[in-house]
Amino acid sequence: MTVLIHVLGSDIPHHNRTVLRFFNDALAATSEHAREFMVVGKDDGLSDSCPALSVQFFPGKKSLAEAVIAKAKANRQQRFFFHGQFNPTLWLALLSGGIKPSQFYWHIWGADLYELSSGLRYKLFYPLRRLAQKRVGCVFATRGDLSFFAKTHPKVRGELLYFPTRMDASLNTMANDRQREGKMTILVGNSGDRSNEHIAALRAVHQQFGDTVKVVVPMGYPPHNEAYIEEVRQAGLELFSEENLQVLSEKLEFDAYLTLLRQCALGYFIFARQQGIGTLCLLIQAGIPCVLNRENPFWQDMTEQHLPVLFTTDDLNEDIVREAQRQLASVDKNTIAFFSPNYLQGWQRALAIAAGEVA
């Protein structure tokens, strides 16, 4: 049998590193279909830190796409597992027959599914991508994204799968004994990416709580974002006093990020699509409820796991937040499907499906 090849077709260092390390540490030892990767970006020590994997790096999307298409045409039994699909050339290859549906398996990351960019080239490309998506052999996604995808592509097979968020299962009970009183701290957004709509989110938080809460905005990723960070900071200072606004411009190490999250009473995410599942997982693990946009279908995954969900359209106050904290504290977090190690079973099944080992 031909070994499955995994494709990370865009240079997104943080996510790509997470996926590679997860496969190296959790999957490669037990499956030959978890070892071969084609990745856009620089090695930057990844080969050394992932010795169980065979990783081929490419300088750009186009060179990777050309290599994938060549492999697909040379051997029609060759299957590919695309992790997040932000590579237009690969979509066009699927649409034109360069890559066959039986060769194309796609794990949706969220941003690659929704049509939120307003630029002309995106608006011209989206209809073609939609046509190509009808030809995918199987999609893997959160419950909410599967539901969203099925509305336009009901005939494409869909399987539940969660991004492998880095988590320490021993921390699942860390929030149960915590004192929750005093001024609330609210986390706004999951990164410095503009998709977080930071300024609109800050205004929404201020409308709900006024200048009575402390707001923390993590913006250390992506890099080279200074102008937008300053724009968010100035907008925040028009709403909140200086002591109640903390805009973080430096990238935090994982343990420091966990410490930051544990100081929060609430996470506030205004974006209208599934994203930031890693931050959501870490907040929920710490017993911190989250406010979501009703258009973000991840609320379906949360309610399926019996987790409290607050919405941006709700009338929020401290009593409601504290009640959500109480409800979250009563949940057995060891049973949550999108937590580590529970998502591992979904990955093992996804590999078997994509490799053609199970129907």
UniProtKB/Swiss-Prot annotation:
EC number(s) in its UniProt entry? Answer: 2.4.1.325
Q: According to its UniProt record, what is one Pfam family this protein matches?
A: Glyco_transf_56
Return the broad EC class: transferase
Sorted alphabetically, the Gene Ontology BP terms of this entry are: enterobacterial common antigen biosynthetic process; fucosylation
Recorded GO molecular functions are: 4-acetamido-4,6-dideoxy-D-galactose transferase activity; fucosyltransferase activity
Q: Does the keyword Membrane apply?
A: yes
The protein's role, per its UniProt record: Catalyzes the synthesis of Und-PP-GlcNAc-ManNAcA-Fuc4NAc (Lipid III), the third lipid-linked intermediate involved in ECA synthesis.
Q: Which family does it belong to?
A: Belongs to the glycosyltransferase 56 family.
Q: What is the protein name given in its UniProt record? A: TDP-N-acetylfucosamine:lipid II N-acetylfucosaminyltransferase
Query: Which organism was this protein described from?
Result: Escherichia coli O157:H7
Source taxonomy: Bacteria, Pseudomonadati, Pseudomonadota, Gammaproteobacteria, Enterobacterales
**The encoding gene:** wecF
